[in-house]
Amino acid sequence: SRGEFATSYTPYQPEVSQGTLQAIFEFQTMVCLLTGMEIANASMYDGASALAEAVIMANRINRRNEFLVSSAIHPEYRSVVETYTRGSKFDLQEVPYTAEGGTDLEFILKNLTENTSAVVIQSPNFFGTVEKYVSLAESLSKNGTLLIVAVAEAISLGILKPPGERGADIVVGEGQSFGLPVSF
């Protein structure tokens, strides 16, 4: 394990942390290239908390309270989203998955309302299915609904078309696979 990167916190004194800040900048630049997004944030705890923060961010962007959350998202990610939003006015509606293991996109389109803030999916999802969401993204943008895509396995971004190029508005992920395995 690399001891100098033992924390997810961004250093507060840039004058004594140039090396760490440079590493974070390089990481964010690479994340932008892999996700197809214009900007990236670092220093979230993990992919699950990043997804929860993305849901809260979507609400702040469009002031809507309904979220359609795919049941094909990793259960631990969904649990963290539920924990973060408990006690708020957020309405998390579970979207079923199909027999093929993908999110039921027809269900999403049928249940989309003017108060739907975002649709939340994971690709590849918990079952390993690469979601087909380009046409969904186009439909959502007409409604002003955001598309949040979670990427639990960052290495997949090396072979899949970036979520940003497929219509995702917000992309979150887990960066563990870029480093060493957990060592405790």
Where are these regions (language model features)?
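Conserved PLP-enzyme active-site core in the AAT-like
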Residues: 49-184
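Conserved N-terminal alpha-helix of the aminotransferase class I/II PLP-enzyme fold
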Residues: 2-50
